[in-house]
Regions:
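Residues within the helices of the helix-turn-helix
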Residues: 18, 29, 61
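Recognition helix of helix-turn-helix/homeodomain-like DNA-binding domains
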Residues: 37-53
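Short, basic-rich loop-to-helix N-cap that marks the start of a DNA-contacting helix
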Residues: 50-65
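Short C-terminal boundary/hinge segments that cap the last helix of small helical domains
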Residues: 67-79
Length: 79
């Protein structure tokens, strides 16, 4: 992850959240509800980085616990 811009890092995180969520068979609504939100807007917007929306560290920690994956998994780039 050398020479990566903040925007590129956000894209990596967004793609990984969506990938791991889908792998666990959860919809955006399922994940949103388990995170304590009443709608999908936070998850759906952050998964596509819509209007500069991103997951914060607290949200990523909660998602990693819900999906039962390592926190650092969100930051891994595919080769």
């Amino acid at each position: 992850m050398h020479n990566i811009t903040p925007e590129q890092l956000y894209q990596v995180i967004c793609k990984n959240v969506a990938k791991y969520r889908k792998a666990k068979g959860l919809s955006q609504l399922d994940l949103s509800l388990q995170m304590g939100y009443k709608s999908v807007s936070v998850v759906s917007g952050a998964e596509i980085c819509y209007s500069n929306k991103h997951f914060n560290l607290e949200q990523l920690l909660k998602i990693s616990q819900i999906l039962n994956i390592e926190f650092c998994s969100f930051f891994k780039q595919e080769a």
